[in-house]
């Protein structure tokens, strides 16, 4: 389990409704459900990740957050979590506005782009590194 999951869980009260945008394989949702009795729902673009969530019994919708968040009603969740995903959006400002509309509060975590290895890879190769915590290329 990622250390980040514990930090996010500490920010969320028990027994709340949480939307995890860019939920990946559902690991964070599963952790929040088990540890905090949180009612979770995910939104994920990748079909394989959606299938993993379904296999784990987690409620997930396949969709693109940039084009489909408008379908969620205002204040329909207590919290919205956006974990390690913001950097992948073409229009992050619009995504954040939608998250603030959907949830009463929003928790956002981003990769540490100041880490020297990340900066060196960007400088010398012009690309973001692929790691265990950021396995997707973009």
Kindly give the residue locations of the regions a language model identified.
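Class I SAM-dependent methyltransferase SAM/SAH-binding core
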Residues: 27, 31-68
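Conserved alpha-helix/loop element of class I SAM-dependent methyltransferases that forms part
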Residues: 1-15
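Class I SAM-dependent methyltransferase "Motif I" SAM/SAH-binding loop
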Residues: 22-24
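A short acidic, Gly/Pro-enriched loop at the edge of an enzyme's catalytic core
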Residues: 71-79
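A short SAM/SAH-binding and catalytic strip from SAM-dependent methyltransferases
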Residues: 79-91
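Alpha-helix C-terminal capping/helix-to-coil transition sites in glycosyltransferase folds
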Residues: 14, 75-76, 102
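S-adenosyl-L-methionine-dependent methyltransferase catalytic module, highlighting the catalytic core
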Residues: 93-101, 105-138
């Amino acid at each position: 389990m990622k250390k980040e999951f514990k930090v996010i869980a500490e920010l969320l009260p028990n027994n709340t409704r949480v939307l995890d945008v860019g939920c990946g394989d559902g690991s964070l949702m599963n952790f929040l459900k088990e540890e905090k009795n949180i009612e979770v729902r995910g939104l994920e673009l990748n079909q394989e990740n959606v299938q993993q969530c379904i296999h784990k019994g987690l409620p997930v919708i396949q969709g693109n957050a940039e084009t489909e968040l408008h379908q969620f009603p205002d204040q329909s969740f207590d919290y919205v979590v956006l974990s390690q995903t913001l950097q992948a959006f073409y229009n992050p400002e619009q995504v954040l506005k939608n998250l603030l509309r959907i949830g009463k509060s929003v928790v956002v975590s981003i990769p540490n782009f100041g880490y020297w290895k990340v900066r060196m890879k960007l400088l010398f190769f012009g690309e973001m590194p692929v790691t265990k915590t950021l396995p997707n290329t973009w």
